[in-house]
Amino acid sequence: MRRAKITIVGAGNVGATCAHWCAAAELGDVVLLDIPRTEDMPRGKALDLMQASPIMGFDSNIVGTTDYADTADSDVIVVTAGLPRKPGMSRDDLLATNAKIVTSVAEEIKATSPNAVIIVVSNPLDAMVQQMFKVTGFEPAKVIGQAGVLDTARYRTFLAMELGVSVEDISALLMGGHGDTMVPVPSCTSVGGIPVTQLISKERLDEIVDRTRKGGAEIVSLLKTGSAYYAPAAACAQMVEAIVKDKKRVIPVAAYCDSEYGVGGYYVGVPVVLGSGGVERIIELSLTDEETKAFQNSVDAVKSLVSTMDGLLAE
């Protein structure tokens, strides 16, 4: 049986860690790509990972390269390329530079792997995945953004820490943009099947939501020289697994919404069924009035971000 071919674009912390997770889980063979000026760096990381395989007991081929020809006919491509956040920066501060990087990557993917499912990780996420979709011209189901899995994982972690319970017993959902306007859905949040609102006061829940919104910035401020990578890479690997194994996972991703939720042609975080074809369907929830208002506010922020990006690229 043919192994899946998984390409990671960007061999920095997120990309290399994602390659590690994917290889260790034997999700397929991995190509780790970076720009030519990095010279042999991706090859070095790939070789290091390969040498871990006999110790950790996984059997995946891992190749490092600076040539998109080596990525040809990939099944899944994870795009982590772009400048990372530094202390004091918002995700939006990266907009102009990373939009140009993502445009270049999109053109290469279109030429070499026209049938791939693309997972965009580069920030600001909601604008970058929109740009990837625009430049590749791929069907919208095959271009998705990694945001909701990570945001929900952070939310679940903080809830578990607050309650002193296992993270495995926390079920939660966050929607909307990847940033300060992300929307918690309390009606879809439970602890061992118990509604979270029965266990935590609204005031304390609001504080946990606020920490979740600032979760990436908190890590940036602690690291000082970089941004989060273990959890973002793990989130990517979970999405890759859902695709290559056709698992039909119900998870939140940045998906192209047209009529869904009345969004009107933008990428925004919503729950989907994720399988071999990418987004197989978007799940539309009945939100409360408060949740609906917060979600629309988040969508408006995404639209404004995309409009700003389009203006910068047109200059």
From Swiss-Prot:
It catalyses: (S)-malate + NAD(+) = oxaloacetate + NADH + H(+). Pfam families: Ldh_1_C (PF02866), Ldh_1_N (PF00056). The active site is at H178. Substrate binds at R85, R91, N123, R154. Belongs to the LDH/MDH superfamily. MDH type 3 family. PANTHER family: L-2-HYDROXYCARBOXYLATE DEHYDROGENASE (NAD(P)(+)) (PTHR43128), L-LACTATE DEHYDROGENASE (PTHR43128:SF16). This is Malate dehydrogenase. It comes from Rhodopirellula baltica (strain DSM 10527 / NCIMB 13988 / SH1). The gene is mdh.
